[in-house]
Amino acid sequence: MKTFFFAIFSIALGIGSIQSQTLLTETTWGGAGSDVAEGVASAADGSSYVVGITDSFTTDQFGNPSSKIFVVKFGPDGSLSWQRIWNGTTIRGLGRPDVAVSPDGSVYVTGITADNQNDAVLLKFDPNGTLLWERAWGGAASDEGLAVATASDGSVYIAGTAESFGPSSSGLFVVKFDSAGNLIWQRISDGAAGNAVAVASDGSVYAAGTTPRPGQIGNFDIVVLKITAAGSLVWQRTYSAGDVVDPRGRMAAGSDGSIVMVGAIQTVSRRTADIAALVVKLTSDGALVFDKQFDGRATETGDGVTVAPDNTIYVAGTTTSFGAGNQDAFVLHLQPTGKKLLDALTWGGTGFETGAGVAVSGATLMLAMTTTTAPPYSLLAASARLSAPRGTLAVVEGVLADVPGVAADPAAGAAIPDGSTTFSGSFEAALVRIAR
C-alpha cells in the first residue's frame, strides 16, 4: 500500500472558497482482472467497507473469468484488514452491489445472484469477515438487489427492481429482514424500477427509483416512497426535470428526517444529449427542499451520497469535464440548504476513474472509486458550479402491494481471495480517505 499526504489550499471559485483538504490515504485493491467498486460504508470505529464485482479470482467451467461480489474491509488507518468474495454466481453489468453497517457493527451486502433466473441476494458478515448468513429473494423472473440500509433495531432493508410480480414488466421492491435473516415483509410499487433505500432515525423507510413520465414516451421521472417500519405507505412523490432523471447514486437520510437522492439528469436537444449530476433533497413530509445539478462541458453523474452528522451533504460521482485524466471521480460538499457548494474536488490519474460511493466517520471522508491507472493520482480542486434544474414535485396516490416472494438460503458461502493493494492492471477498486 502506498500512502500519500498533501494539502490543497483555498482557491477562489466564485462559489465561495474551497476549504483546505488533506488526503490521508489512497489504496487500490484487486487482481489481474477487473475489480469494480460500487459502494462504501463506514463503521463507528473509523473502518470502512468497499463492495463491488470482481472477476480476478475465479473461473467458470470453461476457464473464463467468473464474476463475484466482493467486500473488502479497511482499518481506521486505511490499511487492508480482510477481503472476501461470495461464492454464489453474479452478473457483471446487471445491478450494483451495495453495503451498509448496522449499529452493532454487522456488515450487510446486497446484489444479484444468477440463480433462479436472477434473484436479489443479501449477505451478513460480522466485523471480522465471517459470513453469518445469506439469503436469496425473488420469484420466477429477474429480481435485482440494488440498495441496502439498516435500522437502529437491527432490521435491514433491501430495494431494487423486481420483474416477478405485478401486472407491469417491473416494480420497485422493498423487503425487510430481521437481524437473523427472517423475512418480515415484502412490498412492491408496480410500474417503477428501484435504485435506492434509506432509513431515518425514527425508523421511517424511504425508497426511490424511476417511473415513466405520463404522456411522454421515453422520458422518466424519479419516484420516492415513504414507508412505515410495518410496511405501510405514508406518501409517494414524483420528481420531474429535463427529459430523464434517475436516482442511480442512491439516497441517504439526515438526522432531521430529510432525505437526499443523487443521480443524473439528461436533457436532449436536436444536436446533443447533456447529462449532469443531480442532487434532490426532500423533507420528511415529502416537500422539495432543493434540486441542484453539477454540470461541466461534458458528462457528470452522481453515484453516491451521504449526509454528515451536521447535515451537510457529500456527493460522489464521475466527471469527464474536470480533473487530471480522461475521466475522474469527484466529490462535492454542499450546505444543508443546497445554497452553497462548500467543496468540489476530483481524484484520478491519467486514465479513467469512476466515483462509486461516499461515507463519513468522524473527521474522515471515505470515497470508493475505480481506477484504470497505477499511482500517482491527483486530488484537485474543481472550478465547478451548481445550477438549478427547476424540477417539479408531484403528489401521487400510490399503491404499495404485498408480494409472494420467497427468501431462501443459497448456501454458497464465502472465500478469501488473494487480492493485492499493489496495482495489478485493468480495473481496480480504490479507497480514498480525506480529512474533513
Placement of each model-derived feature along the sequence:
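A sequence-level/structural motif corresponding to short, flexible coil/turn segments enriched
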Residues: 19-436
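Bacterial N-terminal signal peptides
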Residues: 6-14
